[in-house]
Swiss-Prot record:
Subcellular location, record wording: Cytoplasm
A single cellular component GO annotation: cytoplasm
UniProt keyword list: ATP-binding, Cytoplasm, NAD, Nucleotide-binding, Nucleotidyltransferase, Pyridine nucleotide biosynthesis, Transferase
Record-level Gene Ontology MF annotations: ATP binding; nicotinamide-nucleotide adenylyltransferase activity
Keyword Phosphoprotein in record: no
InterPro entries: Cyt_trans-like, NMN_Atrans_arc, Rossmann-like_a/b/a_fold
The organism of origin for this protein: Pyrobaculum aerophilum (strain ATCC 51768 / DSM 7523 / JCM 9630 / CIP 104966 / NBRC 100827 / IM2)
Primary site of residence: cytoplasm
Protein name (record): Nicotinamide-nucleotide adenylyltransferase
TM helices/strands, residue ranges: none
NCBIfam families cross-referenced by the UniProt entry: arch_NMN_Atrans, cyt_tran_rel, PRK01153.1
CDD domains from the UniProt entry: NMNAT_Archaea
EC number annotated for this UniProt entry: 2.7.7.1
Length: 178
């Protein structure tokens, strides 16, 4: 079985992520999505919990017509040592042969560890980024809903995501400031 790893934070998942998974599954039997920075939540850069992101990803992929039996989603907490992070990913994920990433540093780590690394398939990269989605939510601009699957927008609304981001923007929840 040919498996690929697709790491990301998915804060929140958007249509570009759905496109990437669909394209990856054209080349492999199964994709392992690692939800990174799993220990962070309720802060501006990482407002959603790992569980919420897994929920959003599953619903987004389902909405995108992706066969969830070919997808494994696992949370991966960050560690301060990058090689330890790599080891943690390898220990938490089923065996994989290929890594898809748009992050040059992640690509370097996996290449040096002997993995085949491929460029993450991109779709409308100028518009589709989780950072942009969070910025639009924070501004109260309803255009953010066009960038994510309807299921993701519904989850963000159901959990009070806009209010969470507004409060996170105050900076009181940033652990490094305590």
């Amino acid at each position: 079985m040919k498996r690929a790893l697709f790491p990301g934070r998915f804060q929140p998942p958007h249509w570009g992520h759905v496109y990437a998974v669909r394209e990856i599954l054209k080349e492999v039997d199964e994709v392992i999505i690692t939800v990174g920075s799993a220990q962070f939540n309720y802060i501006l850069k990482d407002p959603f919990t790992a569980g919420e992101r897994i929920w959003m990803l599953r619903e987004a992929l389902r909405e995108g017509g992706i066969d969830l039996s070919r997808v494994v989603i696992i949370p991966v907490p960050n560690v301060e040592n990058n090689l330890e992070w790599l080891g943690r990913v390898k220990s938490l994920a089923p065996p994989f042969q290929i890594v898809y990433t748009g992050n040059p540093f992640v690509a370097l780590l996996f290449k040096e560890a002997g993995y085949e690394v491929r460029q993450q398939p991109m779709f409308r990269r100028e518009q589709l980024s989780s950072t942009r989605v969070r910025e639009l939510i924070l501004k109260g601009d309803p255009q953010w809903e066009e960038l994510v699957p309807k299921s993701v927008a519904a989850i963000i609304k159901a959990i009070g995501g806009a209010e969470r981001l507004r409060i996170a923007a105050l900076g009181e929840a940033e652990p490094h400031k305590w």
